[in-house]
């Protein structure tokens, strides 16, 4: 192969956003931590963003979004079927993606929408933006994630228009999800759809978080019941079967919910940061912490 041909190929790859040449310091401590987590929780992939003590929460979130965007860009291939959940973390991640890849991938919602229809984090906005950035296709969901009754939810799920979406759920290659934290975090764009009775029931059953708008306890057990039956979204057992299920989340307050997801292997790829992983290991009383040098926190 001629040198000029290689040069042209590299230039084209850079232009399409496939290749980015950067010189970065290799963090051996983070690498070792990733290997430990990957082995402990049987993960296909993990990306741990280093933390600097002076970083604000906003800066930490931005670093996470950039790392997640870079990972997703690498993983989406020609004709991939990609399921997308929604929320602030995923919205920020999608905003960070810069891609000129032409993939013809299909991007589909895996949960109903929030109550605030104009939200920039609405799942329909996210699948549209992903399809635009990867020169792919998308379909929308035209129902809020929580319905008033199980009968209403069943009617929507059984409808002709919803069949196409459910068919794609059965063929997902990749799922990209956020992970919600404790019940006390109520400023979410969909938790206002929950009733007082929903909150009371979830508190009694010790919910620690949610994913795809499905609540679970500290062991990762899905909390089934009236709320579950009113929820439009992929259930976590289904998420577990997706070849690449990517969870994107950070913060100590979410560590219990992330740990629960890992215990049940609902996700096989985690993108998070250093302080979150260390908090997870503290919750697990993992001896690995005894050997870890807290250089940057």
Annotated model-derived regions:
Residues 17-32:
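Short Lys/Arg-enriched helix C-cap and helix-to-coil transition segments
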Residues 188-218, 269:
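Gly/Ser/Thr-rich active-site loops/lids in small-molecule metabolic enzymes
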Residues 7-10:
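Key DNA-contacting residues within the recognition helix of helix-turn-helix
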Residues 1-2:
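Short coil turns linking two alpha-helices in DNA-binding domains
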Residues 31-32, 218, 222-297:
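ATP/nucleoside-binding phosphotransfer catalytic cores, i.e., glycine-rich phosphate-binding loops
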Residues 35, 40-80, 102-183, 190-192, ...:
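Ligand-binding beta-strand-loop-alpha-helix segment within the catalytic cores
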Residues 82-92, 181-183, 251-253:
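Gly/Ser/Thr-rich loops at beta-strand to alpha-helix junctions
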């Amino acid at each position: 192969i001629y040198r000029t041909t290689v040069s042209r190929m590299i230039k084209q790859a850079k232009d399409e956003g496939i290749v980015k040449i950067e010189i970065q310091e290799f963090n051996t401590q983070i690498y070792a931590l990733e290997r430990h987590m990957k082995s402990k929780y049987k993960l296909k992939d993990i990306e741990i963003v280093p933390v600097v003590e002076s970083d604000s929460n906003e800066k930490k979130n931005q670093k996470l979004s950039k790392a997640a965007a870079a990972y997703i860009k690498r993983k989406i291939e020609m004709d991939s079927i990609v399921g997308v959940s929604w929320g602030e973390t995923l919205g920020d991640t999608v905003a960070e993606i810069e891609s000129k890849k032409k993939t013809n991938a299909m991007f589909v919602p895996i949960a109903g929408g929030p109550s605030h229809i104009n939200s920039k984090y609405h799942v329909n906005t996210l699948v549209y933006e992903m399809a635009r950035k990867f020169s792919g296709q998308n379909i929308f969901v035209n129902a809020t994630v929580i319905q008033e009754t199980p009968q209403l939810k069943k009617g929507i799920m059984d409808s002709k228009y919803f069949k196409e979406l459910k068919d794609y759920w059965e063929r997902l290659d990749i799922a990209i999800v956020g992970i919600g934290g404790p019940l006390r975090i109520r400023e979410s764009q969909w938790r206002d759809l929950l009733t007082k009775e929903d909150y009371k029931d979830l508190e009694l059953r010790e919910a620690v978080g949610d994913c795809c708008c499905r609540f679970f306890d500290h062991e990762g057990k899905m909390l089934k019941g009236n709320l579950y039956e009113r929820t439009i979204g992929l259930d976590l057992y289904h998420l577990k079967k997706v070849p690449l299920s990517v969870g994107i989340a950070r913060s100590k307050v979410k560590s219990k919910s992330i740990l629960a997801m890992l215990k049940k292997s609902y996700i096989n790829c985690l993108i998070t940061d250093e302080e979150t992983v260390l908090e997870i290991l503290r919750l697990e009383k993992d001896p690995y912490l005894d050997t870890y040098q807290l250089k940057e926190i």
